[in-house]
């Protein structure tokens, strides 16, 4: 079984690499960002609540995100593993995830962190905003998201390193180069 976490700052390529890896491993990609954006688009109660935070570049409250994850990992397609993309983002969320998985008889096997310099991230995200028209990808919001990441998410590296589950991967390179580096860490 492969239960994998993809970590890295916004724009590091987590979503792109997750799609490739999930297809190769035949496991589902669980993207909290995609689930939240869909809820916002459909104006569900959770989506309306989440939108306020997302528009400001702030993290959506743990209670909302944990509930989403709990429901999702119980689905049949997660029986043989899953890849979490964009969660956990804080040590508190990681603790809650570990407790949730333990109750389900599961655990995280590997946490992969994609490392990309801030200047490259800003360039990628501004380019994505133009191509995809994502409202949450303007320069002020991007800088706030990177600041949030640096303050709240970076401590997760120590959390998973202490569990001997962390792999650091250079996220700068061609799609194929980065994919190859990630696959080496999963052997």
UniProtKB/Swiss-Prot annotation:
SUPFAM superfamilies: P-loop containing nucleoside triphosphate hydrolases. Its EC number is 2.7.4.3. Residues 127-137 are annotated as: LID. One of its GO terms (biological process) is AMP salvage. Residues 31-60 are annotated as: NMP. PROSITE patterns: ADENYLATE_KINASE (PS00113). InterPro entries: Adenyl_kin_sub, Adenylat/UMP-CMP_kin, Adenylat_kinase_CS, P-loop_NTPase. It is found in: Cytoplasm. Keywords: ATP-binding, Cytoplasm, Kinase, Nucleotide biosynthesis, Nucleotide-binding, Transferase. Pathway: Purine metabolism; AMP biosynthesis via salvage pathway; AMP from ADP: step 1/1. The keyword ATP-binding applies. ATP binds at residues 11-16, 128, 173. The keyword Kinase applies. Its main location: cytoplasm. It comes from the Bacteria. It catalyses: AMP + ATP = 2 ADP. One of its GO terms (cellular component) is cytoplasm. It is an enzyme of class 2 (transferase). Belongs to the adenylate kinase family. Consists of three domains, a large central CORE domain and two small peripheral domains, NMPbind and LID, which undergo movements during catalysis. The LID domain closes over the site of phosphoryl transfer upon ATP binding. Assembling and dissambling the active center during each catalytic cycle provides an effective means to prevent ATP hydrolysis. HAMAP family: Adenylate_kinase_Adk. NCBIfam families: adk (TIGR01351), PRK00279.1-3 (NF001381), PRK14527.1 (NF011100), PRK14528.1 (NF011101), PRK14531.1 (NF011104), PRK14532.1 (NF011105). Monomer. Catalyzes the reversible transfer of the terminal phosphate group between ATP and AMP. Plays an important role in cellular energy homeostasis and in adenine nucleotide metabolism. This is Adenylate kinase. It comes from Leptospira borgpetersenii serovar Hardjo-bovis (strain JB197).
